[in-house]
């Protein structure tokens, strides 16, 4: 094709992409079904991972839950089984009420499987993934959610904690994707969800290791998405989830300027997951929560660095992590004193 003609074709496609994006904001797209599909969630024992598990259970997915904490993972599984029982009871009641079978969702083998896995250890991931393939089947939806935070200033943070943060928050995404992507490529079907953070799009002081891990996983996700497009594997979808501070306790103590905080409070975990689920089930490539994060990210990319610093100071975002770090340090000192260290 002549380059001039191709240029106008590309221009039209770019403008059309803007039209489609605007339409998605105005008209909610229809959600796809994940009923009967195998959905694997890392870090499922608590926080967002647990809530993701409950949301996928309500949509009749077959769940595979990974967490390093066996007890909390089993607690999540118990909640999932309770949802499954309610769904089965509702289906039975609907049949007794005389509803046609076509009005009831098709029956699925509703099961939940739990695995204790440290996603920060490559061999552990590969071995557990092999067990999943043998005991459950191939994974259709992969939700890379597991995450940790050290809570130390850079010069006070032990090297081992820095490495741990990078392994769990970033490297683990490589290992899980390498484990389950090959089959997705073979059948050209699947969905990979990357739970990152707004701190993977812009940073702040005091969490260098966490920001580096989240920036890294955002880059990984974007490159993977481009690779799938280049391979014309349009049946494999990807969704990048970048929430603002979520009130799960992970960053307890983090505070922005008190006059600003009522307008930008920590997100409720339920709200965050529901927004992410909407994006996943409508094949949205990326979701930032709240939407203000899109503007912040855009401003950061066009403003001079000193202008960004001024904005951070005005919002109280420049040292927002300091109270959180101080609380972590105090808790560590208390534990050491309690244990006689």
Curated annotation (Swiss-Prot):
Chemical reaction(s) catalysed: all-trans-retinol + NADP(+) = all-trans-retinal + NADPH + H(+)
Top EC class for this record: oxidoreductase
Protein keywords: Endoplasmic reticulum, Lipid metabolism, Membrane, Microsome, NADP, Oxidoreductase, Signal-anchor, Transmembrane, Transmembrane helix
EC identifiers of the protein: 1.1.1.300
Residues that coordinate or bind substrate: 197
Pathway: Cofactor metabolism; retinol metabolism
GO cellular component: endoplasmic reticulum membrane; membrane
Keyword rRNA processing: no
Gene Ontology molecular functions: all-trans-retinol dehydrogenase (NAD+) activity; all-trans-retinol dehydrogenase (NADP+) activity
Pfam family membership, one: adh_short
GO BP terms in the entry: animal organ morphogenesis; bud elongation involved in lung branching; ear development; embryonic camera-type eye development; embryonic forelimb morphogenesis; embryonic organ development; embryonic viscerocranium morphogenesis; gonad development
Top-rank taxon, per record: Eukaryota
CDD domains xrefs: 17beta-HSDXI-like_SDR_c
Catalytic-site annotation from UniProt: 210
Binding-site list for NADP(+): 40-64
Location of this chain's protein in the cell: Microsome membrane; Endoplasmic reticulum membrane
Residues annotated as transmembrane: 3-23
Tissues/organs with expression: Detected in retinal pigment epithelium (at protein level).
Topology with respect to the bilayer: Single-pass membrane protein
Function: Retinol dehydrogenase with a clear preference for NADP. Converts all-trans-retinol to all-trans-retinal. Has no detectable activity towards 11-cis-retinol, 9-cis-retinol and 13-cis-retinol. Required for normal embryonic development.
Family according to the record: Belongs to the short-chain dehydrogenases/reductases (SDR) family.
UniProt-recorded name of the protein: Retinol dehydrogenase 10
Organism listed in the record: Mus musculus (Mouse)
Lineage: Eukaryota, Metazoa, Chordata, Craniata, Vertebrata
